[in-house]
Design a protein with these regions (language model features):
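Membrane-interface extramembranous regions
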Residues: 1-130
Length: 130
């Protein structure tokens, strides 16, 4: 297993733990917000497990990159305009949220680097006689 994949696994696991720990408090804000945090925790934990048990192939890092990008985008919306059904009022920015977003950003960049590295390392096949 590679160090980069380990970084993505760590980012998934840390963010899963944080989202899971924050889910009960977000249920106080509304059922939708609580469910969103619980689902994101489960998805991140599942990704950490998937990347650990089945590390081969481009699909796990691609899904991880997509999930991290979605979490970062949803937080940007939640803090600027709010999210219509889940959290209609803009959420205040706090230190724990910023730390979580830092882990997600590291996970996103590292997952994308795994995809880029895989694309670059594909062997070029030359036709015979050239």
């Amino acid at each position: 297993m590679s160090l980069r994949r380990d970084v993505v696994i760590l980012a998934c696991a840390v963010c899963a733990g944080i989202h899971g720990a924050l889910a009960p408090a977000h249920f106080d804000d509304g059922v939708g917000a609580g469910i969103a945090f619980a689902v994101s925790a489960a998805v991140l934990a599942g990704l950490a497990l998937w990347l650990t048990l089945r590390p081969a192939g481009p699909l796990p890092p691609a899904v991880a990159a997509l999930v991290f990008a979605g979490l970062l985008a949803s937080y940007a919306l939640a803090t600027t305009t709010g999210v219509l059904v889940l959290h209609p009022e803009p959420e205040p920015v706090d230190g724990l949220a910023l730390a979580t977003k830092a882990f997600e950003l590291v996970g996103l960049v590292t997952a994308l680097s795994l995809l880029r590295r895989r694309a670059i390392s594909l062997p070029l096949i030359q036709p015979k006689g050239t």
